[in-house]
Amino acid sequence: MQIQVHTLSRIAASVLLASVAAHASAAGTVVLDTYPLGQDPFGWPSRVFADDSGRQDIAVPFTLTSATSVQSILTSLDGLGGVTLGILASQGSTPVGGAWLYSTHLTDPVMDTTLSPTGWSLGAGTYWLAAVADTGFAGQWQSGTEDYSGDWAQADANGWSAVTSTFIGMPAARITVAAAVAVPEPGTYALMLAGGLLVAALARRKSNARQQG
């Protein structure tokens, strides 16, 4: 009898672990990745700057198929001074300027540094990850490769415009968002119910054994 109880306990534990795994959220989902293999950008470095001669800001688009939140952002942005990195809404082939959905201010950003924002929740749609220079910032956002991987955008004092050249790769960026929680299949629900009943039966059996002892 003792062996049978131990066997049932192991079965119950296995079923419960399976139910927990079914409810666990999956790892984050990458929705934009313009980095090359090995995460070492080697494409054209596009300037990000603002000084007396003018300015240039850079943005890359990404699309979400469902509501989610941003887990991490990796870019090749690098430079000296202050710059704002954040999310802008989309209007046609360019970002909507001047209205940050979310942003963070960086000082002397270093290439390939990961940011982990909190509370950056977005609905389904197309957005832009943008770097907008403070006055005096001098830096660059290097393309991941020299191969065309899609249009992006740049801005001067007159606003945003699309970059459609097939000779320049998109600036390197990787955006990871929270994945949807896995929904158990009907068979998994049955296993969870069976596991719960089995645990209850084991508890009753142990209670009866103590009372008889």
Give residue ranges: language-model regions.
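Extended extracellular/luminal ectodomain segments enriched in beta-structured repeat modules
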Residues: 65-72
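N-terminal secretory signal peptides that target proteins for export/translocation
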Residues: 1-6, 210-213
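C-terminal membrane-anchoring or membrane-association module
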Residues: 200-213
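A short, hydrophobic C-terminal helix/tail in secreted or cell-surface proteins
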Residues: 184-203
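Aromatic- and Gly/Pro-enriched, solvent-exposed loop/edge beta-strand patches characteristic
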Residues: 76-158
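PGST-rich, cysteine-poor low-complexity/disordered linker and tail segments that act as flexible spacers
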Residues: 27-39, 46-47, 56-60, 80, ...
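Short beta-strands within extracellular/lumenal beta-sheet-rich domains
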Residues: 52-64, 112-115
